[in-house]
């Protein structure tokens, strides 16, 4: 899959169980340093862009003359690094705090994945980065620890799928 294909949305929706009743995931998005955020899906067709960007991509492109540079790519690329960018991580007007960072070895491919837990008050989001630099942002639905644990598992499973696809 290329970052510009429309398949990403459906793949996210399927792998993160966004069509199920009471899913653990509220919204998810994929990001790369080359493309910025290039796919976002929400539960039950909800507009997921509002969780990851200040404005929708089409409006953003018009507003900045087609330059999709409004994602803070430099800062976003550090979310799964040892040291965060000094600006921190700001998504759609929310300053997220990184609570933890882990290196996880994918059981199927043996690929090393980087997993970060972000917090904004009682809200949480998992971010997993593949070796090829594709990041999956998974916003947990609600504040329960069970949903956070399930969303973590779904995020890792999805990135395992990406690693198997060569990402």
Model-derived features with residue positions:
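Non-catalytic interaction/Regulatory regions outside core domains
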Residues: 1-167
